From Swiss-Prot:
Residues 1-29 are annotated as: Disordered. The keyword Transit peptide does not apply. Interacts with host CCNT1. Associates with the P-TEFb complex composed at least of Tat, P-TEFb (CDK9 and CCNT1), TAR RNA, RNA Pol II. Recruits the HATs CREBBP, TAF1/TFIID, EP300, PCAF and GCN5L2. Interacts with host KAT5/Tip60; this interaction targets the latter to degradation. Interacts with the host deacetylase SIRT1. Interacts with host capping enzyme RNGTT; this interaction stimulates RNGTT. Binds to host KDR, and to the host integrins ITGAV/ITGB3 and ITGA5/ITGB1. Interacts with host KPNB1/importin beta-1 without previous binding to KPNA1/importin alpha-1. Interacts with EIF2AK2. Transcriptional activator that increases RNA Pol II processivity, thereby increasing the level of full-length viral transcripts. Recognizes a hairpin structure at the 5'-LTR of the nascent viral mRNAs referred to as the transactivation responsive RNA element (TAR) and recruits the cyclin T1-CDK9 complex (P-TEFb complex) that will in turn hyperphosphorylate the RNA polymerase II to allow efficient elongation. The CDK9 component of P-TEFb and other Tat-activated kinases hyperphosphorylate the C-terminus of RNA Pol II that becomes stabilized and much more processive. Extracellular circulating Tat can be endocytosed by surrounding uninfected cells via the binding to several surface receptors such as CD26, CXCR4, heparan sulfate proteoglycans (HSPG) or LDLR. Neurons are rarely infected, but they internalize Tat via their LDLR. Endosomal low pH allows Tat to cross the endosome membrane to enter the cytosol and eventually further translocate into the nucleus, thereby inducing severe cell dysfunctions ranging from cell activation to cell death. This is Protein Tat. HIV-1 lineages are divided in three main groups, M (for Major), O (for Outlier), and N (for New, or Non-M, Non-O). The vast majority of strains found worldwide belong to the group M. Group O seems to be endemic to and largely confined to Cameroon and neighboring countries in West Central Africa, where these viruses represent a small minority of HIV-1 strains. The group N is represented by a limited number of isolates from Cameroonian persons. The group M is further subdivided in 9 clades or subtypes (A to D, F to H, J and K). It comes from the Viruses. One of its GO terms (cellular component) is host cell nucleolus. Its main location: host cell. It is found in: Host nucleus, Host nucleolus; Host cytoplasm; Secreted. Acetylation by EP300, CREBBP, GCN5L2/GCN5 and PCAF regulates the transactivation activity of Tat.
Length: 29
């Protein structure tokens, strides 16, 4: 997974960023 697999880094980075943004907006709200 550290070799930047096709669809793996994009699928894991999208949900991870969305989760981090939601977590930062949740407590910030």
């Amino acid at each position: 997974p550290s070799s930047q697999p096709r669809g793996d880094p994009t699928g894991q980075e999208e949900p991870k960023k969305k989760v981090e943004k939601k977590t930062t907006t949740d407590p910030f709200d």
